[in-house]
Amino acid sequence: MMHAVTRKDSIQKLTVLNTKSETPFIPYQGKIIRRITTNELGFSKTLQDTSSRIRYVGTRIVNVLHRNTRGWVIKNHLFFRENTVLNAYILADNERYLRSLDFIRDARIVVRRVGNTDSVDVEVVTKDLFTITGALKVKGVKGIGARGAEANFLGMGQRIQITTLLDRNRQPAFGYEFLYSKSSLGKSLATITVGYTVVNSGISTGMEEEKALYFRIFRPLVSPYSRLAGGLEISFNSSQNYFRKPEPDFYRYAYDLVDVWAGYNLGVTKLLQKGAIRDRSFLALRLLHNDFTHLPEQVAGNFDPVYNSKKAVLAEFTLFRQDFYKSNYIYGFGTTEDIPSGYNLAITTGWFKQLQLQRPYAGFNANHFVTSKRGELAQYFVRAGGFWNNGKMQDASLLVGGNMFSKLYLLNTLKLRANVRFSYTRTFNRITSEPLRINNPFGLRSFRADSAQGIQRISMYTESFVLTTYRVLGFQLAPFGFTDFSLLSPNQEKIYKQNLYSGFGGGVRTRNENLIFGTLELRFIYFPKTPETFRAFKIAFKSNLRFRYNSRYVKAPDIIQLNSDETLQY
């Protein structure tokens, strides 16, 4: 367990420490909340010391351009109310939830006593991200694309995004996208999104340019004391031959998607009366209908993991206990990060249809999150699943692995940390599922060739990074070095006899924590062994990387994914 802290009030100087999230609120457990106020900081103040001011030209400019989140918008994202009993765990969960919002950089909830009464006042202090973003992409002399977005338009928790494209090789030459999103619509804590695109920025199931009209709504389980979670996605998609590929090479297809799920936190009313108990159970049901109304001729009626119609009814029972610690300098550059500690076990069963093949499915996903007194962090996981057909298992899989961080080392003004990730994957009797590949989070970073495929995979990634105090225009620099290894077996032979794929190199990451777009990364890589068409040396630049420790309690029921993973950063 990480060390806790003792305070006279719920916070003194808003300092981020390695402490349990609920610790500042425990002294006020059971008090009556008299009043709730909000305090939206500008870019000239910090959460660590609200009395000091940051004064430079950039701060003045963004303060002029930016509209702070309105107080009523912040209150729409709260799940505690005035004239109710204070629950320390709910306040801690709410503070963490506020930090997860796209337009909030950091948040603190401050509790203050009201004289000698049994009442308290609660102040919600937030610091926004600068949410106006833009991007420009030049494609030689014949093409140019631009994207502009405001993720907190008018300070009302709504996102407006417009993308345009002009390319002489494209017919028509002009393309566009429009997206609108609203957070916690009607105090529901649900986010709605609607969009239309002709520039391949939708779901894009296939490999061609796609046109799409889509609608999404998502409500997370914001706290172990919350009752409901769920989501809905409806989209209409079709491939478009904008760049006039020859017909034999172009995959012409169209598909409609309806994906809905909902879940209920079992026994939450009883557990609310016993606030310290954090063990929970959650039951969810998902209905999936992905219908290809037009199939590409290249696939016809053959099994294909991408271009087949799919229907599924999946139920998932989740047992979990996740407490959180407030820490920093893990994935971020100093802003508060919420680190889970505990377990999460999800058991999934249901029915799945692909083309005319109908099969029952069963699987499980077990995760253990560990923190130590020294500040070390780890996530260990075991995932397995498969289909039953004709008296035997089909498309069965096993995936085990871990993701570990060392404690934070201080060397003068430098902060150093190491990260190790490893995984082992095995598939059995593959019929319709994708083969294992290494161009994903369970393989080699920036290795884009998809010709390396197999049924068994072992991977390990190690990285050491240094966080400096040096800034350029508000962007903090973090150099890193890494090694990457993968063994991939295409058959039943022993995996240690297979060819070793590896990558070595280093680079630098940078981020301005006041801006909404994510981390920028420049990576230099050497691959000793590559396919013939793949260069051994590579320079990779990525923008808008979202490095954040996974902290979701539950998700939509799903089959085990072997070539992608939202809980591992990539």
Which ranges hold each PLM region?
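Immediate N-terminus of the mature polypeptide
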Residues: 1-391, 404-570
